[in-house]
């Protein structure tokens, strides 16, 4: 994995209020995107790793940064949330609180 991939991921995470690394065929990704898109009104960025040439490298970079290789890989305001189960376990009020704090709703 390249230093460039890590820098690209860090830049994407830093430049979006909500960043999700996803794969189009992943049911957990779909659930996370559905939850977030129903609440987030401003700057939800989803990167579908299976639709881009450097998707595997991006996934490796995410593992290096977070210790998590699985998708979805979710960040709110630059903070690593985790996967779909982590997102869902926040509960609606805590999730909305985090999203409000970063200006995503």
Predicted region positions:
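Thioredoxin-like thiol-disulfide oxidoreductase module
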Residues: 49-69, 95-104
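Non-catalytic, surface beta->alpha helical segment in thiol-disulfide oxidoreductase systems
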Residues: 76-105
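N-terminal organelle transit peptides
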Residues: 1-7, 105
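A structure-centric feature marking long, well-folded core domains of fungal metabolic enzymes
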Residues: 6-18, 57, 93-96, 101
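Local sequence-structure signature of Cys/Sec-based thiol-disulfide redox active-site neighborhoods
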Residues: 5-47
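Alpha-helical recognition domains of nuclear gene-regulatory proteins
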Residues: 12, 35-38, 61, 65, ...
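Conserved, well-structured core segments
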Residues: 23, 73, 82
């Amino acid at each position: 994995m390249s230093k460039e991939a890590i820098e690209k991921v860090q830049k994407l995470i830093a430049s979006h209020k909500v960043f999700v690394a996803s794969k189009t065929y992943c049911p957990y990704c779909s659930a996370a995107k559905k939850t977030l898109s129903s609440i987030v009104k401003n700057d939800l960025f989803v990167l579908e790793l299976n639709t881009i040439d450097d998707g595997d490298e991006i996934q490796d970079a995410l593992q290096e940064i977070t210790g998590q290789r699985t998708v979805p890989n979710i960040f709110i305001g630059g903070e690593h949330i985790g996967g779909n189960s982590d997102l869902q376990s926040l509960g609606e009020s805590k999730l909305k609180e985090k999203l409000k704090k970063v200006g995503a709703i």
